Structure formats: C-alpha cells, structure tokens
C-alpha cells in the first residue's frame, strides 16, 4: 500500500478524520442510524495496482480502506495521492488515474470530460463525510463563537481585527485582542474551499458576496497548500484564522470555533452528534447511481444542535470502464471500503456508514463494470 500526498509518501496523522455517511434511502431521504456488521461481498480480480488521487480530506480514511482492500484481495492494492480535489478530477479525466476523490461533485463541464474519458457516464459516489472546522490561533483565546455572516466578513476582509464589534457581540464577556486578523486560505484547487465558500454564501445572508468554487475568492489573506499546509500556517501565525478538514484540526490540536446557526442561538461545536444531525437532513439530487447530494440543507439547518459546515467526499468513477480489468478492481476496492473497511472506524474517531445508506451505495458500486 502507498498513500501519497503531493507525490511523497503520506505520513498518516495519528488522529482520525470524522467519516459520517448517512444520507440516502429509497425515497432520497437521509438516515444517520448505526451501521451493522461489515460483511459485504468483495469480488476480487482485475488490475493489480490501482491508482487514484484527489481529496486530502479523505486521506486518513484511505489508510483503513486500502488495508481492507489488500486483506480482502491479496496481491491487489491502491496507491492514493492526496493532492486536492481539483487535481483528483483533472487526473481522472486525463486518464492518469483509475478514479478520483473530490469534496465536490463533478461540475457540468467536468461531467462532459469524464464521460469522454470513460466512454460512459461518470458517477459521483459519496463515501466519506466530514465537517470543516474554522480554526484560529489567538493567544489566550480558547473559545470563539462565530456565525455565517461574521465568518464571511472575516474571510472577505470586511472584518480585520479580532476585537471588531461584530465578533464581540457573539462572544460577550470575552476579552478579544486589538490585533489584526491574518486570514489563511487554500491556494490549491480544493473541494474543501468550495464547500466552505458554499457555506458562507448560503449562511451569511448576503455578507459574503463572492460566490463559491474550488479556488478561494475572498480576496484577502495568505495561501497555503492542502489541509496540512493551512494547519501548519495557523500553528505558526499569531492572530490567524483558516478552515480545515476536522481530522487535521484535531491532529494539530488547533482551536476550533463554535458556530451559531439559523436553528437556534446556541453555538454548536463539532462532534459526531452535531454533524450526524446535519447529515440526517441530506437529500440525493443525482439520478440513478450518480449519488450527488443536495447539501444546501447542511448550511442552514432547522434542527438545533446541528453543525453546519459539512462536506461529502465523492469517489468519481466510470460506470463502465474502457478496460474491464480496471472496472473489476475499482468495484472490488469500493466493495471492501463499504464492507470490512468500516470495521474499527469508531475506534479512531470515524463513524461507519449507516445501513440505510450503505445499501444504496452498495447497489451503485455493484453496478460498476
């Protein structure tokens, strides 16, 4: 097994990412119930060494998934390069990899390129779910509340100091320093950035005004590459703030803001429970086995205690591969991922895929040829 980040061997972080999957049923509703035992059938065979790349948010989960694949199918493996969602889609469409990992589903233009690459429709299969943390480094500030509008104003430069009245109003009684805010953003094409900006666009009630996309549009701050790059920048910079996939924030022991949502006045911290409540409201907007999620319900939840900044990581696959040996192996890898790959995830801070969604996801996986 090889797990690569930016072409180098991935050093797996000791703290696990939160993997929440509970967003599908026969009626396009979502469920967040507990998963049952992982005994899914794996039909091994095909290409011996698969190659994939993309999302850094799923890099930690991939460790367990690749191990499960190697155990289920001796002599087969997957080499995964965690180089960002944009690269994952580009390399998949360029036939450099066998599938891509992306924190955003394919855009219309990417669908066309993927169909040309595959010679068949491409499918977005959501396998990993995780929250995005707003992390910060301010000496003496161990707790911080933000809402969508205030976060948007920080990340587009409308708020520039930590003791701004807008921040102070959300943190009564907290001594906020009169020091400048240093915004750090992802400077690579990133599904994490896309999802974070979608949250700002939806939850800020017009305060963001920059739109979304895989490149950061805030117009302020300093760039860093990948979740690990932004995490390192925050640790090194007093007065800084950024957005990270949760496992990186945990691994680097970064301070994480609590988020006030449209569902109630209480600020909500990231937890399995708070993210599970959010995912329970997800709907599938894709057709057939293309399991694209409608995530707008994440960003403005109606249930109190829901953490709103959540992304889904998709595996971008061909429905019918030009080389059937590749299709067989990709199917086997994903079968082991939703099967034995789920075992023990909770021990490392992961949440297994609930049965309600696993059955729908498995049906799509089994249809890959």
From Swiss-Prot:
GO terms for molecular function: phosphate ion binding. A lipid is attached at residue 23 (S-diacylglycerol cysteine). Part of the ABC transporter complex PstSACB involved in phosphate import. A lipid is attached at residue 23 (N-palmitoyl cysteine). Belongs to the PstS family. The keyword Glycosyltransferase does not apply. GO terms for cellular component: ATP-binding cassette (ABC) transporter complex. Phosphate binds at residues 55-57, 85, 103, 190-192. It comes from Mycobacterium avium. InterPro entries: ABC_phos-bd_PstS, PBP_domain, Phosphate-bind_PstS. It is found in: Cell membrane. GO terms for biological process: phosphate ion transmembrane transport. Pfam families: PBP_like_2 (PF12849). Residues 1-22 form the signal peptide. The complex is composed of two ATP-binding proteins (PstB), two transmembrane proteins (PstC and PstA) and a solute-binding protein (PstS). Disulfide bonds: none annotated. Keywords: Cell membrane, Lipoprotein, Membrane, Palmitate, Phosphate transport, Signal, Transport. It is a lipid-anchor. This is Phosphate-binding protein PstS 3. The keyword Cell membrane applies.
């Amino acid at each position: 097994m090889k797990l690569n980040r930016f072409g180098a061997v991935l050093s797996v972080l000791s703290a696990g990412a939160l993997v929440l999957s509970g967003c599908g049923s026969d009626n396009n509703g979502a469920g967040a119930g507990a998963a049952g035992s992982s005994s899914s059938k794996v039909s091994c065979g095909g290409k011996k060494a698969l190659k994939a790349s993309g999302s850094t948010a799923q890099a930690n989960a991939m460790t367990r998934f690749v191990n499960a694949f190697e155990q289920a199918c001796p002599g087969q493996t997957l080499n995964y390069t965690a180089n960002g969602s944009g690269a994952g889609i580009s390399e998949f469409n360029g036939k450099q990899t066998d599938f891509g990992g992306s924190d955003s589903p394919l855009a219309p233009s990417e669908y066309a390129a993927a169909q040309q690459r595959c010679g068949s429709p491409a499918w977005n299969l959501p396998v990993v779910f995780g929250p995005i943390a707003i992390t910060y480094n301010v000496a003496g500030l161990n707790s911080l509340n933000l809402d969508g509008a205030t976060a948007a104003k920080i990340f587009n430069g409308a708020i520039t100091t930590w003791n701004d009245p807008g921040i102070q109003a959300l943190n009564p009684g907290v001594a906020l320093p009169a020091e400048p805010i240093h915004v750090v953003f992802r400077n690579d094409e990133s599904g994490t950035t896309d999802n974070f900006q979608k949250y700002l666009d939806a939850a800020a009630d017009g305060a963001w005004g920059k739109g979304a996309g895989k490149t950061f549009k805030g117009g302020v701050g300093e760039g860093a590459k990948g979740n690990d790059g932004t995490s390192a920048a925050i640790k090194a910079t007093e007065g800084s703030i950024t957005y990270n996939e949760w496992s990186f924030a945990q691994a680097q022991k970064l301070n994480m803001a609590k988020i006030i949502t449209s569902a109630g006045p209480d600020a909500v911290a990231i937890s399995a429970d708070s993210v599970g409540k959010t995912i329970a409201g997800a709907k599938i907007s894709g057709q057939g086995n293309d399991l694209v999620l409608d995530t707008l319900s994440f960003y403005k939840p109606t249930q109190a205690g829901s953490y709103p900044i959540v992304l889904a990581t998709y595996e971008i696959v061909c429905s019918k591969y030009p080389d059937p040996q590749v299709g067989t192996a990709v199917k086997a890898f994903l079968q082991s991922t939703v099967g034995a790959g789920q075992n023990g995830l909770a021990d490392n801070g992961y949440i297994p895929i609930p049965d309600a969604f696993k059955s729908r996801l498995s049906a799509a996986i089994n249809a890959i040829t």
